């Protein structure tokens, strides 16, 4: 069996019909040690004090959706993704994600 270990599988990989299952160990939040990321997260747009926070969360959710999409590359492709990070549930409740992603999530 093929085993691929990478710190980031959200972009740059196209392995159709090759990934039966994958593990996402951690939600890929951007590094708050980066001053630009921190400034964007803390940004308030007018009276919307949480604008930057929501953008930060939406970016992380988009990375999760992209990573999960690596396991399913075609309509007839199958793959299972296990997301282990306990921070995923609160993120899932708060952040935007596409309907097709929400329809495929099953909680264990």
Regions found by a protein language model. Give the residues of each.
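ASCE RecA-like P-loop NTPase motor cores
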Residues: 1-108
């Amino acid at each position: 069996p093929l085993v691929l270990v990478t710190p980031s599988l959200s972009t740059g990989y196209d392995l159709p019909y090759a990934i039966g299952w994958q593990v996402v160990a951690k939600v890929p939040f951007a590094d708050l040690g980066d001053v630009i990321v921190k400034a964007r997260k803390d940004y308030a747009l007018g009276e919307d004090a949480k604008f930057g926070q929501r953008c930060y969360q939406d970016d992380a959710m988009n990375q999760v959706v992209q990573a999960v999409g690596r396991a399913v590359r075609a309509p007839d492709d199958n793959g299972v993704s296990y997301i282990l990070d306990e921070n995923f549930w609160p993120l899932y409740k708060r952040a935007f994600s596409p309907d097709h992603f929400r329809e495929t999530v099953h909680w264990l």
